[in-house]
Design a protein with these regions (language model features):
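Auxiliary, metal-adjacent structural segments of Zn-dependent hydrolase domains
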Residues: 342-408, 417-418
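A well-structured
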Residues: 76-351, 520, 587
């Protein structure tokens, strides 16, 4: 029985790691503050973790007779009239052409701006030249995003994998070029006029001295080394081959699709034993390069660089550390108590085919107002989403933006069960934000507020399209996921803090594994006797490799989402109203947006106690 309990715990934990690390809006790629309508780079590749099948209990209980699925009440729909206005004519995603972008156009456009500034040309001459720079920038990142999406749609497609790796390395050069353009404008006699008419408040002061440039030649070289290491990581996890105890070599993901119970567990041990040392070395090399980036940019360490430059957070690493300690105090004990009941592991997520999923999603968004419904139908009309299951797809879900077309794209790794509803809702929250706001500048913490809040709002709108049993399961599953998210993402955040606080020369695969194992113990998601395996599970967290210091965003931003949910529970419609008001935001930052909406800061005294009390009432009564 103990081994079966371990198996259930491991499978659920690994699945949770896969689900929670696969929900990013966009990556922390090297970028500069974008001029109006600038595009984004694509989202990262989260952990490659398959969907497990647990061995059945030796004393199975009879399955209850399924309740009939209610027929949804049809709701009127008005054809969307949105005109996106991108520089390229919008076509369905699968008809969008791909062509490797050249930087010649961007270089020529930047040179033309410099010549016009030197010649003292008026703003009316310079504005279209700056627009040409933005167009070239958008074209590059649109192709970057398309290559990423298509490499995720078929991870065996070597063409798009190579294209994405090439453009990922080149992105540092693009950022350096754009930064030089901004300094050229900020150091010109027209700096103030350009700030007022074209750029953003504070632009002239920010770019008045190019000795403060972030993208030095040294930094670009380090970023390219980082990109090459990311490519090495992606190659390792794309299609791993494991050697079994009898010497047989098998494709890991293919074998997992067919394995069950103890065979599944044996494959896990084989994979982690063989790939942890390789991936750990890649990770250590990444940490060394990133610490060098921090020195190059004048930061004390990479954690400070990530908080200040990469994520532009409106809270400090010190505040984050205090928040993690509060999670240990108020959330971890509740997590341990709830998980000991076994209720979370016994939830049956059932099955959900693609057509029924589409019916459920369409019904849910139809009850969120015309704007949300229009956005969904526009997405479907132009096939700006991929919700289909395929064994060739990357095991992740994300949303990214196609700047040249002025539209987002939603990618989801479908599991074929009720969990697809919340996975879609999360990414559609990102999609809705990107669509409504044309991907206007915002911090990732704010972006996660919109995605996590929509997950919870969707739960409140499915009573006519799910059976009572399905809705109860989905509700409990989501609440358990939230509790796990607070605990596990906090552990991951502390893991990164410890690793990046260690002298890089003292890092080894054994040390990294030991740090992660100790945090598994401290945060309550480990099993005595299987320490060797638990210490190696961290290699499934793609954010460690591709988006360092992202994970703290999940628990911090979820506090805002929980406040929206509580409003909806107390007064139906109030939470949605608050959400839509926040969506049309006046601020790019999480705290300013939340406080302006009348919500509390996640860092206010007592906030985590309130979250724990709410979760206890829902999960333990």
């Amino acid at each position: 029985m103990r081994t079966q309990k371990l198996l259930a715990l491991l499978l659920a934990l690994i699945l949770c790691l896969s689900m929670m690390t696969g929900c990013a809006k966009k990556p922390v790629a090297p970028t500069v503050p974008a001029a109006p309508a600038a595009g984004d780079s694509p989202a990262p590749a989260p952990a490659s973790t398959p969907k497990p099948t647990a061995e059945p209990s030796p004393e199975p209980t009879p399955e209850p007779t399924p309740e009939p699925t209610p027929e949804p009440t049809p709701k009127p729909y008005v054809e969307p009239t949105s005109e996106r206005g991108g520089m390229w004519d919008l076509v369905p995603f699968d008809e969008m052409p791909y062509e490797r972008p050249s930087l010649d156009g961007l270089d020529a456009a930047i040179e033309a701006v410099g010549e016009a500034l030197d010649a003292g040309e008026p703003y009316e001459v310079i504005e279209p030249l700056l627009d040409a720079c933005d167009d070239a920038y958008n074209a590059f990142y649109t192709m970057y995003s398309i290559s990423f999406i298509r490499s995720c749609q078929d991870k065996t497609d070597e063409f798009y994998a190579d294209e994405y790796a090439y453009l990922d390395e080149l992105s540092a050069d693009v950022s350096q070029r754009m930064e030089k353009l901004y300094f050229r404008c900020g150091m010109s006699d027209m700096a103030q006029e350009l700030e007022e008419k074209y750029f953003w408040p504070g632009f002239a002061e920010e770019y008045a001295d190019d000795s403060n440039a972030f993208y030095s030649d040294e930094m670009v070289e380090l970023l390219q080394k980082d990109a090459n290491l990311v490519a090495d990581y992606r190659e390792l996890v794309a299609n791993p081959i494991v050697t079994l105890s009898d010497g047989t070599e098998v494709e890991y993901f293919t074998a997992l699709e067919e394995a069950e119970g103890f065979s599944y567990l044996s494959l896990l041990f084989a994979y982690y034993n063989q790939y942890n040392p390789q991936l750990a070395q890649v990770y250590i090399d990444m940490v060394k390069v990133r610490q060098q980036q921090a020195v190059s940019a004048g930061y004390a360490n990479y954690e400070e660089l990530a908080f200040d430059h990469s994520f532009e957070r409106d809270y400090s690493p010190e505040q984050a550390a205090e928040y993690l300690q509060a999670i240990k105090t108020y959330i971890v004990p509740l997590y341990k108590e709830y998980m000991d009941t076994g209720a979370y592991w016994s939830l049956d997520q059932g099955s959900l085919d693609a057509q029924r999923l589409e019916d459920i999603l369409r019904y849910g968004v139809s009850d969120m107002g015309q704007e949300v419904q229009d956005t969904y139908e526009f997405m479907v009309k132009y096939r700006l989403c991929d919700l289909e299951y395929s064994p060739k797809k990357s095991e992740m879900s994300f949303q990214t933006y196609l700047g040249a077309y002025e539209v987002p794209f939603l990618f989801m790794d479908s599991s074929g069960n009720l969990g697809d509803i919340t996975t879609f809702s999360h990414e559609f929250g990102h999609y809705l934000d990107g669509f409504v706001n044309y991907d206007a500048d915002e911090t990732l913490d704010l972006a996660e507020c919109f995605s996590q809040a929509l997950e919870l709002l969707m739960l409140t709108r499915l009573d006519e399209v799910l059976s009572p049993q399905e809705l109860d399961t989905l509700y409990k599953m989501k609440m358990g996921d939230i509790l796990s998210m607070y605990v596990q993402q906090a552990a991951f955040a502390e893991f990164e803090h410890i690793i990046y606080s260690t002298d890089p020369e003292d890092l080894s695969p054994e040390y990294v594994n030991q740090v992660f194992l100790q945090l598994c113990v401290d945060y309550g998601f480990s099993e005595a006797g299987f320490e060797d395996l638990y210490g190696k599970l961290w290699i499934d967290i793609s954010h460690f490799f591709e988006q360092p210091f992202y994970v703290i965003t999940y628990p911090v931003s979820h506090d805002i989402a929980m406040q929206v949910f509580q409003l909806e529970e107390e007064n139906p419609g109030a939470g949605l109203e608050k959400y839509l008001a926040m969506l049309h935001r006046d601020y790019p930052d999480m705290l300013d947006t939340a406080l302006n909406a009348g919500l509390e800061s996640p860092f206010d005294p007592g906030r985590l106690e309130k979250v724990a009390a709410t979760m206890r009432e829902i999960l333990l009564g």
